[in-house]
């Protein structure tokens, strides 16, 4: 946006989809209703500096227990956990946390950024739209204010699409998002707040109240589809 003299700084390592972060994010996002407790438990353990967690699967349906166990095993095989052990008789999964900062960051919210990034990239590619996409973009305004945007796309010949990702409390950030949208000079439909905490009705209500677009994991793809088709 040269008219507004806004400068964007990219870190290309953050959009490298050759690792397993994007696949893991997609699994967590698509099965979020089932995996939310696992994510919360891991986040809590990191915050409290606990080295491990136990997941008791005995009170779940066989299908759900199997899905969670399989996910944990897959995440372990891709080094998201340092150790994985399933105690079959007790139906307990024992997980030792990985100390690598990139993995901790992933569980603390990075997975949602990856999920939104991949969703946006997929929508653009499916429609053959040339666009630059990036995660964690530092944006410098003319007065040298620095802001970081979680996910941004610059579709050719169109205004930017910004997605801010919140896997926890987001209400205190609404005012910041409103100011940011105005400074970027983009339509409310193109400034998206993606949160795991809202159902469709709540997201629609907040979208009506504020000049922003609120979505959840289920409605993100649908909203992006309407933007990319436009």
Q: What are the functions of these language-model segments?
A:
Residues 1-230:
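Intrinsically disordered, low-complexity Ser/Thr/Pro/Gly-rich regulatory segments
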């Amino acid at each position: 946006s040269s008219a507004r003299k806004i400068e964007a700084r990219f870190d290309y390592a953050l959009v490298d989809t050759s690792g397993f972060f994007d696949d893991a994010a997609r699994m967590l996002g698509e099965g979020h209703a089932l995996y939310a407790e696992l994510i919360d438990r891991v986040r809590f353990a990191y915050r409290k500096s606990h080295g491990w967690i136990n997941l008791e699967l005995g009170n779940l349906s066989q299908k759900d227990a199997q899905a969670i166990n399989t996910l944990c095993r897959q995440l372990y095989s891709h080094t998201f956990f340092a150790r994985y052990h399933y105690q079959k008789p007790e139906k307990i999964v024992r997980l030792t946390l990985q100390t690598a900062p990139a993995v901790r960051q992933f569980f603390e919210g990075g997975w949602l950024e990856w999920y939104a990034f991949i969703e946006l990239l997929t929508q653009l590619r499916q429609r053959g739209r040339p666009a630059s996409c990036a995660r964690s973009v530092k944006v410098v305004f003319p007065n040298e204010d620095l802001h970081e945007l979680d996910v941004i796309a610059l579709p050719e010949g169109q205004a930017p699409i910004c997605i801010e990702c919140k896997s926890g409390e987001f209400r205190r950030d609404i005012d910041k998002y409103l100011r940011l949208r105005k400074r970027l000079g983009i339509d409310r439909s193109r400034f998206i707040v993606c949160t795991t905490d809202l159902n469709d009705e709540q997201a629609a209500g907040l979208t009506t109240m504020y000049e922003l677009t609120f979505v959840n994991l289920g409605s993100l793809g649908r909203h992006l589809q309407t933007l990319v088709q436009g």
